UniProtKB/Swiss-Prot annotation:
Inhibited by UTP. ATP binds at residues 13-16, 56, 60, 163, 169, 172. It comes from Leptospira interrogans serogroup Icterohaemorrhagiae serovar Lai (strain 56601). It is an enzyme of class 2 (transferase). GO terms for cellular component: cytoplasm. Its EC number is 2.7.4.22. Catalyzes the reversible phosphorylation of UMP to UDP. Its main location: cytoplasm. Homohexamer. This is Uridylate kinase. The gene is pyrH. One of its GO terms (biological process) is 'de novo' CTP biosynthetic process.
Length: 248
């Protein structure tokens, strides 16, 4: 019996570190190709896939702002970094035979389409991978907020937030041996407990539009496909008030 996908259309939020090379800087092409392979496995199930990628492996706008660069300027620099990452992912995906489009919130027409919601939806319907770059196009907004906004705009079923940890914990598991992992928690509890899943703007947008988020470990091979086919992996964040801790 063929494996069936639980979702029809998903948005995968990748941090820049998912592509990072040595010292968590730059782009490791091996990581890009590994991600592309996992994306293809999910695409082959018939799932429509959108991506948002951060730029922290190249530039972190908040760090530049702390170093004295004007915050808006620093954020624009960070947005340009996301475009570089998007192009790297596009190249890797196309080498796996996937049709891909990069849509940027900042006009850069020689290398990416401008973001147009209807066009993005049409690409997804035609089974193209759509990579959203350039953030929201405005400073002071994170790429997590971009992911929330785009997922709502193009009608995704869920946001899969790919991280280096296997879910959301009651405390930092690297610092607290007693930290336990949530298997499920509500948006409001995430905000109230300051669990740093996403910034409050991103979480509020998801909460208001009933857009569930699953936080999972992207570095464990097979997790992405397992999630999409319905396995209980990571932490589900939704409007459900039911809080579950798995004790891990």
């Amino acid at each position: 019996m063929a494996t069936e996908a639980k979702y029809n259309r998903i948005l995968i939020k990748l941090s820049g570190e998912a592509l990072a090379g040595e010292g968590e800087f730059g782009i490791d092409t091996n990581k890009a190709h590994s991600l592309a392979e996992e994306i293809k496995e999910v695409h082959d199930l018939g799932v429509e896939i959108a991506l948002v990628v951060g730029g922290g492996n190249i530039i972190r706008g908040t760090n530049l702002a702390k170093a004295g660069i004007d915050r808006a300027t620093a954020d624009y620099m960070g947005m340009l970094a996301t475009i570089q990452n998007a192009l790297a992912l596009q190249d890797a995906c196309e080498k796996k035979g996937l049709y891909t489009r990069v849509q940027s919130a900042i006009e850069i027409n020689s290398i990416a389409e401008s973001y147009i919601r209807r066009r993005a939806v049409r690409h997804l319907e035609k089974r193209r991978i759509v990579i959203f770059a350039g953030g929201t196009g405005n400073p002071y907004f994170t790429t997590d907020t971009t992911a929330s906004l785009r997922a709502v705009e193009v009608g995704c079923d869920v946001i899969l937030k790919a991280t280096k940890v296997d879910g959301v914990y009651t405390a930092d598991p690297k610092k607290d041996n007693g930290a336990k992992r949530y298997s499920q928690i509500s948006f409001m509890e995430s905000i109230n407990r300051r669990l740093k899943v996403m910034d409050s703007t991103a979480l509020s947008l998801c909460m208001e539009n009933n857009m569930s988020i699953i936080v999972f470990d992207i570095f464990k091979r097979g997790n992405l496909k397992d999630l999409v086919t319905g396995k209980n992996i990571g932490t589900l964040i939704s409007n459900s008030e039911d809080i579950q801790i798995d004790g891990k």
